[in-house]
């Protein structure tokens, strides 16, 4: 597998993918004007790597992200992927406090690693799913550990405001 860093300055992140991601964007139903951006790479029949970015308008992101908020997000992920949460808890990703969960599909076939990283007006969800033991394997860790934010200037520009000039 050939891994390469993918950068999305518009969404404020970089991550290594094992291929070129397909990108889609949609408004989140019932949450207008919240937008969802998905970047996804599939490998073979049963392995996928994705970064989902929820982008809120300036000042509209959740102001208090606590354990309950994270639990609701990972429960929604598990429900959407027909998986059962096996392990969850706080984690540091890209130098930021976040949340991590491991889930299984109940058939013993797919294993998911999910990380949630809030940053400014965005919430990043890194998810990878693959065959048994994938969530604790080298490729899943490589994917998670390669994630980084591309700086506050990028976020300010994408929000429509230029950073203040240096004095």
For each feature predicted by the language model, list its residue ranges.
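A general boundary/transition motif marking the beginning of the first structured unit of a protein
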Residues: 9, 61-65, 135
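Surface-exposed amphipathic alpha-helical segments
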Residues: 21, 66-81, 121-167
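A short acidic-to-branched-hydrophobic micro-motif
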Residues: 38-68, 125-127
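Signature of long, low-cysteine stretches enriched in small and polar/charged residues
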Residues: 16-40, 73-118
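Solvent-exposed coil/turn segments that connect beta secondary-structure elements
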Residues: 11, 54-56, 106, 119-121, ...
